[in-house]
């Protein structure tokens, strides 16, 4: 009797285990089917609820040209150098002016009184010619040449000082720019001009120029030169205002 109960218990246990295995197998097949269907049909939308739209502003929106107050973009004071340049060029002008005055007053045409003395000049051994240093042509020509050389040196020094920039100021609102040039009298007494920002353009990037940054102002001949040894106080603001390229 006990043996029959034992066999009956073993049989019921085997039946229960087989039923559980069959149920688990069917459940796994159903789950695999559902997973396959979900993978095929919903792959595109499965992560869509996790995506949040994010706006990324441009880098230039963080730097605006409409400043709330005057901003000093560039500064480079070379008053001492331009004082020495003014002294040197002024001395050159006085020297050539004196030499021209000496030639005009000392060289005289002596043909009226005696036979004019001629000087024979040879150039490189190829050809030679006679010069009458007392003739009016030589006297006027030598005097004019001295004045032209002295005046040219002084004019070049003045032009260089008028095109060398000491300060660049962006005014409140960002609509106008003031450009101050170098002067031997100091930065407070230097020549300056105030123009709209739309009339200022830079034809070379400040990092590409080796010695000077060329700045073009509409209505003015030649470039305004910004020395690379100067200080750019706000590089980003400089690049989008004065340092930007604009067709003029």
UniProtKB/Swiss-Prot annotation:
<keyword id="KW-0999">Mitochondrion inner membrane</keyword>
<keyword id="KW-0812">Transmembrane</keyword>
<dbReference type="InterPro" id="IPR045325">
    <property type="entry name" value="TMEM70/TMEM186/TMEM223"/>
</dbReference>
<comment type="function">
    <text>Mitochondrial ribosome-associated protein involved in the first steps of cytochrome c oxidase complex (complex IV) biogenesis. Stimulates the translation of MT-CO1 mRNA and is a constituent of early MT-CO1 assembly intermediates.</text>
</comment>
<feature type="transmembrane region" description="Helical">
    <location>
        <begin position="46"/>
        <end position="68"/>
    </location>
</feature>
<dbReference type="GO" id="GO:0097177">
    <property type="term" value="F:mitochondrial ribosome binding"/>
</dbReference>
<dbReference type="Pfam" id="PF06979">
    <property type="entry name" value="TMEM70"/>
</dbReference>
<keyword id="KW-0496">Mitochondrion</keyword>
<comment type="similarity">
    <text>Belongs to the TMEM223 family.</text>
</comment>
<protein>
    <recommendedName>
        <fullName>Transmembrane protein 223</fullName>
    </recommendedName>
</protein>
<dbReference type="GO" id="GO:0005739">
    <property type="term" value="C:mitochondrion"/>
</dbReference>
<dbReference type="GO" id="GO:0033617">
    <property type="term" value="P:mitochondrial cytochrome c oxidase assembly"/>
</dbReference>
<dbReference type="GO" id="GO:0005743">
    <property type="term" value="C:mitochondrial inner membrane"/>
</dbReference>
<keyword id="KW-0472">Membrane</keyword>
<feature type="transmembrane region" description="Helical">
    <location>
        <begin position="84"/>
        <end position="104"/>
    </location>
</feature>
<dbReference type="InterPro" id="IPR026100">
    <property type="entry name" value="Tmem223"/>
</dbReference>
<feature type="transmembrane region" description="Helical">
    <location>
        <begin position="140"/>
        <end position="160"/>
    </location>
</feature>
<keyword id="KW-1133">Transmembrane helix</keyword>
């Amino acid at each position: 009797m006990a043996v029959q109960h034992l066999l009956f218990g073993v049989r019921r246990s085997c039946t229960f285990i087989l039923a559980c295995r069959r149920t688990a197998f069917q459940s796994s097949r159903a789950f695999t089917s559902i997973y396959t269907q979900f993978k095929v049909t919903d792959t595109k939308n499965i992560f869509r609820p996790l995506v949040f739209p994010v706006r990324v502003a441009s880098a230039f929106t963080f730097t605006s040209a409409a400043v709330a107050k005057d901003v000093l973009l560039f500064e480079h004071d070379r008053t001492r150098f331009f004082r020495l340049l003014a002294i040197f060029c002024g001395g050159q002008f006085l020297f050539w002016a004196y030499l021209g005055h000496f030639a005009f007053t000392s060289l005289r045409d002596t043909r009226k009184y005696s036979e004019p003395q001629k000087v024979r000049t040879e150039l490189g051994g190829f050809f030679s010619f006679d010069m009458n240093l007392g003739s009016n042509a030589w006297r006027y020509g030598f005097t004019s040449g001295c004045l032209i050389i002295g005046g040219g040196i002084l004019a070049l020094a003045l032009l260089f000082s008028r095109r060398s920039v000491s300060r660049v100021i962006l005014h409140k609102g960002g609509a106008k720019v003031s450009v101050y040039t170098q002067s031997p009298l100091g930065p407070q007494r230097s020549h300056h001009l105030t123009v709209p920002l739309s009339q200022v353009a830079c034809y070379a990037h400040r990092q590409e120029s080796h010695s000077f940054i060329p700045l073009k102002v509409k209505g003015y001949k030649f470039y305004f030169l910004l020395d690379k040894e100067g200080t750019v106080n706000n590089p980003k603001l400089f690049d989008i205002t004065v340092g930007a390229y604009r067709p003029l």
